[in-house]
Amino acid sequence: GKQNQVTVAAMVFDAYKALEKLSKHPSIDKDKISITGWSLGGGVTLFSAWKPIIEALGQSVNFASHLAFYPPCFFDFEEMCFSDSPIHILIGELDDWTPAKPCDEFVKKLAKSNVNITIYENSHHGFDREGELEFNENGYSFKDCMFDVNTDGDILMNYLNIPMTNPFLQKIGFLFCVERGVTIGGNKNARNKSFKFAKDFMHKTLSQSKKIN
């Protein structure tokens, strides 16, 4: 796809612009708006909970909860400071596109009661699909990647520590660690469990939500 033609920062900005718009709608409770995303969208879901970026955007409204399906977690934040809103990651044990291990380590490192993870056994990227497993020879595998994120929100290239502030630099930065070729496909058990979890998570976090920083 064309996912490397836009930066994560730009997508998070868009997410908060959408939140601002929704929060002004007379039929919507601004304190009961959640964000969820899949794969790269899951990364946006996580980054939208990072306090430095929330503060930099000068946000007056926040997401009530964050539910990320198989997000990229291969980021080492200089400032591990995240929202107190409920944050949950759903990811497959065998994911070779956005690996589960960095997500598990992220949750353990953050060590906050509102941040949790569910890892589905024998499941790959796209476990909530109905299709069979298939190999995508063009997909980026980030299993050997770990990018530093400084306090300004810049994602830095491996080794060079150059901020990937535009799509071109981001594409160059990926070349230092990514490999081509990933597996994607559904797992019926994981799909059913994740759908039920998502429904329960949204019901719980939105029915009980209150303004959280």
Each model region followed by its residue ranges:
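C-terminal catalytic histidine-bearing segment of alpha/beta-hydrolase fold enzymes
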Residues: 114-213
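Hydrophobic pocket-lining residues that define ligand/cofactor binding sites across diverse proteins
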Residues: 22, 26, 110, 202
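Primarily recognizes the serine-hydrolase "nucleophile elbow" in alpha/beta-hydrolase
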Residues: 6-84, 94-97, 101
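Conserved loop-alpha-helix segment in the C-terminal half of the alpha/beta-hydrolase fold
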Residues: 103-112
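Charged catalytic carboxylate motif
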Residues: 14, 102, 193, 197
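Hydrophobic anchor at the start of a short beta-strand
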Residues: 33, 87, 114-117
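Cap/lid segment of the alpha/beta-hydrolase catalytic domain
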Residues: 1-10, 48-53, 136, 173-180
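Short beta-strand/loop motif that positions the catalytic acidic residue
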Residues: 89-91
